[in-house]
Amino acid sequence: MNKLALYCRAGFEKELAGEITDKAAQLGVFGFVNLTEQSGYVIFECYQANEADHLAREIKFEQLIFARQMIVVGELLEDLPTADRISPIIAQYKTLQPKHSSALFVETPDTNEAKALLTFCRKFTVPLRNSLKQEGWLTSSDNVKDSISLHILFIRPGCCYVGYAYNHNKSPFFMGIPRLKFPSDAPSRSTLKLEEAILTFIPINQEKKRFNEQMKGVDLGACPGGWTYQLVKRGLFVYAVDHGKIAATLHETGRIEHCVEDGFKFQPPKLKQMDWLVCDMVERPMRISQLIGKWLMNGWCRETIFNLKLPMKKRYHEVQLCLSLFRQLTKQGLCFKLQAKHLYHDREEITVHIVIMGKK
């Protein structure tokens, strides 16, 4: 098994290919990418043996922007016999001997064509899991060092990649997609973007510390209040900045102040530091990056989540340009952590999280 299979949103295969090639090169690993546009996944094949496993350990999954999942796979299994699809899969795993495996995922790429296989995948999972357990696998705990999950990626009927992922360095979700329910009282579906971002960037055991009733936040471009809703739900008092109307249900909470201003000109009251800044404005990504950079360098907020709307072409290049802008925070003596992700609820955009850790 000397390939990586990485899942993504259909249409972003080239961006993911560029990203994984760069990340591998930074670790001194080289290879080539096989991709089909609109397929929802890419294959990165390493030139040297065992390098795919090395990448799966050393590339921090949380630092991959366009990947929903990252697994090590072998050669594509084609034309699985309908009478016995399991034996060829077991044969591939026998070369691995996955003793420290804990879970099984039988998945497809996130495309309409591939998702037609999901009913089959669900039915196939049970007998395959039983066969794997008979081999002595799938008996480990997630907490065991270097424990893995086994992943089968069906790309079309009778055709799959067999692989695994390290539990400490992967998405915990089936197909790499968190299943979130739209809150009936939320003002807009955009609320799911911020909810997924918080789930992605903030450890669950830190959420109450990072979001609570003693905190204040700012939502730039808040109308009608989808992102404000997520902050208010977690107890924050929010300055909702927008010329447009904010949902009456948010006003009724008593936890917001509607500031009818331009988000690019707004400054925090009395220039006091806010705990949170969130922003989902439709604007050029570089202009948004410059705006967020201003807030961070002026000390107007400690933590921020914002969206960057991507251009139609050279999207990966634009992301690199925008994120490189935040290097100036280091020049200002600020220590920070930055993560960016193309979330499931994002479309032609990525979501970025930055937290200021202190000063040098």
Curated annotation (Swiss-Prot):
Enzyme class: transferase
Catalyzed reactions: cytidine(2498) in 23S rRNA + S-adenosyl-L-methionine = 2'-O-methylcytidine(2498) in 23S rRNA + S-adenosyl-L-homocysteine + H(+)
Residues that coordinate or bind S-adenosyl-L-methionine: 190, 223-226, 242, 262, 280
Gene3D superfamilies: 3.30.2300.20, 3.30.70.2810, Vaccinia Virus protein VP39
Biological process according to GO: methylation; rRNA processing
UniProt key word DNA-binding: no
Top-level division of the source organism's lineage: Bacteria
Chief location category: cytoplasm
Active site: 309
Subcellular location field: Cytoplasm
GO molecular function: S-adenosylmethionine-dependent methyltransferase activity
One term under GO cellular component: cytoplasm
Family: Belongs to the class I-like SAM-binding methyltransferase superfamily. RNA methyltransferase RlmE family. RlmM subfamily.
Job description of the protein: Catalyzes the 2'-O-methylation at nucleotide C2498 in 23S rRNA.
SUBUNIT field: Monomer.
Name of this protein: Ribosomal RNA large subunit methyltransferase M
UniProt organism field: Haemophilus ducreyi (strain 35000HP / ATCC 700724)
Gene expressing this chain: rlmM
